[in-house]
Amino acid sequence: MPFIYINTALAYSMSLLGLLIYRSHLMSSLLCLEGMMLSLFIMMTTMTLNMHLMLMYMLPIILLVFAACEAAVGLALLILISNLYGLDYVQNLNLLQC
């Protein structure tokens, strides 16, 4: 297994571990999710380039589009919660129900 695959798998697992540890704060959770998306992007890009799969060249770009949408929605929720409550705890998401 090449060295870059080991590094990206380690980065993904560290981001997942950070997400599990710091799940009470929304900002920390969003940063860990972005780290997971970045490591997935690097892994998918290297795999498509190494295997020469022509049909999968657009897949990492689609992943980046979904990651950008996820980040935008997460930051909008973070700003909304911070303005309403002054804290970024995930428990405040339950208070936003209509």
Curated annotation (Swiss-Prot):
Alphabetical keyword list: Electron transport, Membrane, Mitochondrion, Mitochondrion inner membrane, NAD, Respiratory chain, Translocase, Transmembrane, Transmembrane helix, Transport, Ubiquinone
PANTHER family found in the cross-reference section: NADH-UBIQUINONE OXIDOREDUCTASE CHAIN 4L, NADH-UBIQUINONE OXIDOREDUCTASE SUBUNIT ND4L
Catalytic activity: a ubiquinone + NADH + 5 H(+)(in) = a ubiquinol + NAD(+) + 4 H(+)(out)
Subunit structure: Core subunit of respiratory chain NADH dehydrogenase (Complex I) which is composed of 45 different subunits.
Entry's Gene Ontology BP terms: ATP synthesis coupled electron transport
Classification of source organism: Eukaryota, Metazoa, Chordata, Craniata, Vertebrata
Gene Ontology MF terms in the entry: NADH dehydrogenase (ubiquinone) activity
Cellular compartment(s): Mitochondrion inner membrane
GO cellular component: mitochondrial inner membrane; respiratory chain complex I
Membrane topology, from the record: Multi-pass membrane protein
Protein name: NADH-ubiquinone oxidoreductase chain 4L
Family per record: Belongs to the complex I subunit 4L family.
E.C. no: 7.1.1.2
Enzyme class: translocase
